[in-house]
């Protein structure tokens, strides 16, 4: 590890991810059992009660050792990807609006007038390559031009990139929430990489348990069904401003229709090639 010019650590051994070996299990091991998975274990992505165990090297024998110990686990399949295949392209420095996003294994360049985000996405969604992530960063840049926010919540934080962006733009407190423990682990690492431990708090849990507290800004780059459910619950309208993303064209139309039932103003929309939509809006005072 080395110190960069902002005083926190970045990687000095190059990209730690080259090959990904993924083992798909029915059910999920206890976190206390993860020490059985050996030195090349990267993390466990839990989806619908199943586990996807990620390793940097072939590790079938470690997985079998875990299954032999925990009989509720069942081996389903295994996969191999290069890291670039998994992430949808090479992870390299990229400029998005006011931000310059740098993988911590890349050289830390001098960039004038840009806010640096050091981001290790691991195997989690949110690497700045996807249009919804980029447009959400643009929306953050736009809304922070108008005011500074005291408290921000980012639900479905993924890698934490949007929560970190809000913190670096000047938010006093940011809460980053995700239901997936691997996303929480990844976000915690990225918060440390950017020196934001005193600003960005990371929690594991359901989105509906954290919103409705009159946050200055809510960020949700998540599944359409969850956004729609949160709006219909009514607690969404207690937030003051919002960024909604992860929406396809017909979904964005349905979301705006649902928002129209509340005193809400859509400030701006980003439309990426007619496919992905991002909405920036605010709740009007009544």
Model features per residue range: what roles?
Residues 78, 102-104, 120, 203-205, ...:
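Conserved beta-strand termini and adjacent loop/short-helix elements that scaffold enzyme active sites
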Residues 51-52, 69, 169, 233, ...:
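Alpha-helical structural signal in soluble globular domains
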Residues 2-109:
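N-terminal auxiliary segments of SAM/dcSAM-dependent transferases
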Residues 179-285:
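S-adenosylmethionine
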């Amino acid at each position: 590890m080395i110190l960069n010019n902002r005083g926190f650590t970045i990687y000095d051994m190059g990209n730690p991810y080259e090959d990904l070996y993924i083992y798909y299990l029915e059910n999920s091991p206890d976190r206390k059992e993860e020490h059985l998975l050996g030195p090349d274990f990267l993390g466990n992505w839990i989806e619908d009660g199943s586990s996807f165990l990620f390793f940097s090297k072939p590790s079938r024998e470690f997985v079998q050792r875990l299954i032999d110990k925990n009989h509720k686990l069942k081996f389903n399949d295994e996969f191999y990807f290069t890291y670039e295949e998994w992430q949808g392209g090479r992870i390299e420095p990229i400029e998005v609006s006011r931000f310059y996003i740098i993988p911590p294994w890349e050289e830390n360049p001098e960039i004038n007038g840009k806010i640096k985000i050091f981001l290790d996405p691991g195997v989690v969604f949110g690497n700045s390559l996807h249009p919804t992530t980029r447009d959400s960063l643009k929306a953050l840049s736009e809304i922070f031009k108008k005011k500074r926010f005291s408290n921000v919540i980012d639900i479905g934080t993924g890698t934490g990139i949007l929560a970190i962006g809000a913190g670096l733009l000047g938010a006093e407190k940011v809460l980053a929430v995700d239901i997936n423990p691997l996303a929480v682990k990844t976000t915690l690492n990225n918060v440390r990489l950017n020196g934001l431990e005193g600003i960005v708090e990371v929690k594991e849990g359901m989105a509906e348990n954290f919103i409705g507290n009159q946050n200055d800004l809510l960020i949700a780059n998540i599944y359409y069904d969850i956004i729609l459910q949160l709006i219909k619950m009514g607690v969404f309208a207690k937030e003051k401003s919002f960024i909604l993303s992860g929406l396809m064209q017909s979904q964005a139309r349905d979301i705006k229709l649902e928002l129209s039932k509340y005193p809400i103003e859509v400030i701006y929309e980003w439309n990426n090639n007619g496919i992905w939509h991002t909405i920036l809006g605010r709740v009007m005072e009544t």
